[in-house]
């Protein structure tokens, strides 16, 4: 009976150790997937911030060029539209329009036009005069924006891909930067865009193998460097 009991205990111990090993592997897989997804979202935010910055600068530039003065160089009522035009850029979700920023069916151009129309409707008697009409300015503003914005957006994309982004990646200022650096630089993990024949599974496997080899320990310790045991900020 005692021998059977010992065998049962040993069997349970073996099963338990196997399940523990499986659980650890699952945890490693979950961690690697989370790290890849986290780096992807960080780079997506970086792309979004740069594209919004480009759109904002371009809209501002075009507004100053086309809305500030009239035909004879006099100040035009439409110059007051710029602030509200930039608010549209700040509020609009970048990826809702950025693949074709000047499309009439996408929200950016629609909402920019709405701003100009609203200002025109409050322009009163001045709208009857061609030299002070805001309605008359809408066409020129839109035409110049259509000519300039797609090129600027493409240039911004190229700059980001070449590592020359106008707006730096904010992750470099965060406590978790060592983990991001580990995935992107040490392991060579790439930002997935769908343009290259590379699956998320390949990226996750790369991180999983590194975790299994214990390579993630130093980056984790780097995140905790200088920690005194007090609660840490989320970032």
Curated annotation (Swiss-Prot):
Main localization, broad class: cytoplasm
Compartments in which it is found: Cytoplasm
InterPro entries: Aromatic_Lyase, L-Aspartase-like, Phe_NH3-lyase_shielding_dom_sf
An individual GO BP term: L-phenylalanine catabolic process
UniProt-annotated binding residues for (E)-cinnamate: 3, 6
CC terms in the record's Gene Ontology section: cytoplasm
Pathways per UniProt: Phenylpropanoid metabolism; trans-cinnamate biosynthesis; trans-cinnamate from L-phenylalanine: step 1/1
Keywords: Cytoplasm, Lyase, Phenylalanine catabolism, Phenylpropanoid metabolism
Coiled-coil segments on the chain, per record: none
Any one Gene Ontology molecular-function term assigned to this protein's record: phenylalanine ammonia-lyase activity
Entry PTM: Contains an active site 4-methylidene-imidazol-5-one (MIO), which is formed autocatalytically by cyclization and dehydration of residues Ala-Ser-Gly.
The protein's assembly and partners: Homotetramer.
PANTHER family: HISTIDINE AMMONIA-LYASE
Family, similarity comment: Belongs to the PAL/histidase family.
Name of the protein this chain belongs to: Phenylalanine ammonia-lyase
Species this protein is from: Malus domestica (Apple)
Gene name per UniProt: PAL
């Amino acid at each position: 009976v005692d021998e059977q009991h010992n065998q049962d205990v040993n069997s349970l111990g073996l099963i338990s150790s196997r399940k523990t090993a499986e659980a650890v592997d699952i945890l490693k897989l979950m961690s690697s997937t989370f790290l890849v997804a986290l780096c992807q979202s960080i780079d997506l935010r970086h792309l979004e911030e740069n594209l919004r910055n480009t759109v904002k600068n371009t809209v501002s530039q075009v507004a100053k060029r086309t809305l500030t003065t009239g035909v004879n160089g006099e100040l035009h009522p439409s110059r007051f539209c710029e602030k509200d035009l930039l608010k549209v850029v700040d509020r609009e979700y970048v990826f809702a329009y950025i693949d074709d920023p000047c499309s009439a069916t996408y929200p950016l151009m629609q909402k920019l036009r709405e701003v100009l129309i609203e200002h025109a409707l409050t322009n009163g008697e001045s709208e009857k005069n061609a030299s002070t009409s805001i309605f008359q300015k809408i066409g020129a503003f839109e035409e110049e924006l259509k000519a300039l914005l797609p090129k600027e957006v493409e240039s911004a994309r190229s700059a980001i891909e070449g590592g020359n982004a106008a707006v730096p990646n904010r992750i470099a200022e965060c406590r978790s930067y060592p983990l991001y650096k580990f995935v992107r630089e040490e392991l060579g993990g790439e930002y997935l865009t769908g343009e290259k024949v590379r699956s998320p599974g390949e990226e996750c496997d790369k991180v999983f193998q590194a975790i299994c080899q214990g390579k993630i320990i130093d980056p984790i310790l780097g995140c905790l460097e200088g920690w005194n045991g007090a609660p840490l900020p989320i970032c």
